[in-house]
Amino acid sequence: FFLADEQMLEILSQSKEPRAVQPHLGKCFEGLNTIKFEKDLKITQMISPEGERVDLTTPIDPESGPNKGNVEKWLLELEGLQWVSVRRQVELALQDYPKQKRIDWCIKWPAQAILAVSQIFWTQKTEEAIDAGGHQGLDKYVLDLNQGLTDIVMLVRGQLSKLQRKTLSALVVMDIHSRDTNVTMVTGLIEKCSDFQWQSQMRYYWGPAWKDGQAVKKGEGTVVARIVNARCLYGYEYLGNSMRLVVTPLTDRCYRTMISAIDLLYGGAPEGPAGTGKTETVKDLSKAISIQCVVFNCSDQLDYKAMAKFFKGLAGCGSWCCFDEFNRISVEVLSVVAQQ
């Protein structure tokens, strides 16, 4: 649904040559640039545009059984294994975190696992600090956060690969926001975890899934994001090693509104002057909960059939869509879109 007809034809017409799919992977999966084929054509790794490699939990054989000559079947298998593999990396990184120094841990795992697990432990330690001594307990934890930030900054200044530097840059952005959030709560004299100052923040927990989620069986451990009364399952879409937005109070407010809307099965429409980061904020929120976000530029030439095709794709794969310049769509098409 998100590929042009020419691209679909090219993929399907070369079904006997699995490697011919490589140029189109970026359109199907946001964080994938290529996949690694072994000599026997088995697929063993996902490779991001930045060059990060993540092992698949089990190899995919496009040349065996029902997969042979059916590119659509092994691509579906790749989609499912992508979720399972990312979840496995997050789970292993979570178990490994308490066993070694953070500066050693954060250059060992894929960027996505590092950011998710760091946020889980920040949530856990912040709640422990508040329970232990309210704003005074939290003030002590802020000192630990500052020390952790200093260690990461020293690491960034050292000898690192381009990939590791990018991962740590994203981690520093997240850590600074976590530290600033805690400083604000100390200033606000927070006393318990149920205070709105803490409940209004994006919090990450590792807990049982309350419904069948992607790559998660009911009751298994998974990452759950919470903000105020809303909660959503982490999507495990592989996003590669991408940079994250610097979070401001307005970004936080937008996150609260959007997640609450999605929890109530609504959509959201950020509004404001051009170039202020509306689209990027929505994209960054999708990265925060690891869900694919497709950006679609609207125009007055768009008809209801094209929109219907897009909605089918969104419903089929569970991804988000950001309709840029939505106001350009003609009223006649908008009325049909509202019905759809």
Predicted segments — roles?
Residues 1-32:
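Amphipathic alpha-helical packing elements
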Residues 246-258:
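N-terminal pre-P-loop "Q-motif" helix
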Residues 319-340:
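Conserved AAA+/SF3 P-loop NTPase catalytic/coupling segment centered on the Walker-B
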